[in-house]
Amino acid sequence: MGSKRVCPDANNSVKSKKAKTLDFLAHPRRKIAIQFFYLGWEHDGLVQQPHTQNTVENHIMQALIKTHLIEDWTKCDFSRCGRTDKGVSAFKQTAAMVVRSLCPGDSGVFWSDSTQEHQKVDYKASGEELPYVKMLNGVLPKTIRVFAWAPVAQTFNARFDCNRRTYKYSFAKADLNLEKMRQGAELLVGEHDFSNFCQIDMNEKRLLQSYVRKVYEVKVEQVSTHPENDMYSMVELTVSGSGFLWHMIRYIVTILQEIGRENEQPSLISQLLDLKKYPSRPQYTLASDTPLCLFDCGYKSEDVEWKVHDYTLKSTVTGLQKTWATYQARSRMMENMLGELTGMAEFSSGDANKGLHEFVQDRPIPSNYIRFENRKMCESLESKKEKMAEKKKNGEESSDKL
């Protein structure tokens, strides 16, 4: 009988130079959740895509493989809470995966079904788990930071076990009527069919899904006051709910902006929620992606108990402070320029705020505003479902003829 291999403790294993290959069958494993943030404008979205390597998940995958926490991306039972598009940021984003462990005696730690007894590494009873956060941050780009981890059940799914998601969207106050925006925002609270507040393509899964979502809370708050010009004060929209549809927050922002600009009344929200009045979505544009952040993903406390370590947290805060200081310095530089330039000519109310509105609307502001009641309508959900059914039927008939 050969003796079991001895594995050093967690600290020594991190310091030692890892071999290029690792026998994963010799090591126990556990399912963990990680909590992380990323700056969306630096990446091409969260989810892996064939045409780019600069997605957040691709960087995380590479980090997990480089640190020998996983052997194969397709076999680690990966799940993420909320999908974010290119340009959209996240804080307290959550993902779960099965990784290598140092603690075979811990609850939730298990061995592969393929592992033989003689293959198992004999771990010293250090009681210390691998420093997952430190290991991942050591190889991730600085625009992606992990700041907490938690042991979770093998059945845990970061998406389906999430019971509350919170988004934040920041924009300049400009000349917006915040009180009217708040009145409109309150009408979003509750369980509604939000099909007029999202994008619906010909994806079969999206066509067949329910468009009913429950919004718990919506707030429109002025979060900073500019000392020289109130139009540069910052406002934040916060929306919490059970889940959200594709581009739902960005469409909500567009509508609230028009209400704030007093082009529409707050009652427009109720009208768009009434599918008898608006059986399909009026044509209106999508708000800019950069100000949007998936701010929080909530779970039951019995499902997830986050572990945060002071050293890694302090390091993350220091790095984020440097990034914040960089953008603040640039912002102040531009404020000085704007102050000088706007003093050189007389601006109408509309011209003075034009750039602030166009940034959020992500398009030039039209000279003649068209009210929602007079706009062309998008194709209805029912019409798209009928087209999809017809397409499938024709495809089946073609197959039968072959």
Curated annotation (Swiss-Prot):
It comes from the Eukaryota. One of its GO terms (molecular function) is pseudouridine synthase activity. Gene3D superfamilies: Pseudouridine synthase I, catalytic domain, C-terminal subdomain, Pseudouridine synthase I, catalytic domain, N-terminal subdomain. Its EC number is 5.4.99.-. It catalyses: a uridine in tRNA = a pseudouridine in tRNA. The active site is at D85 (nucleophile). Keywords: Isomerase, tRNA processing. GO terms for cellular component: cytoplasm; nucleus. Residues 383-402 are annotated as: Disordered. The keyword Ribonucleoprotein does not apply. Signal peptide: none annotated. One of its GO terms (biological process) is mRNA pseudouridine synthesis. It is an enzyme of class 5 (isomerase). HAMAP family: TruA (MF_00171). Belongs to the tRNA pseudouridine synthase TruA family. PANTHER family: PSEUDOURIDYLATE SYNTHASE (PTHR11142), TRNA PSEUDOURIDINE(38_39) SYNTHASE (PTHR11142:SF5). Formation of pseudouridine at position 38 and 39 in the anticodon stem and loop of transfer RNAs. This is Probable tRNA pseudouridine synthase tag-124. The lineage of its organism: Eukaryota, Metazoa, Ecdysozoa, Nematoda, Chromadorea. The gene is tag-124.
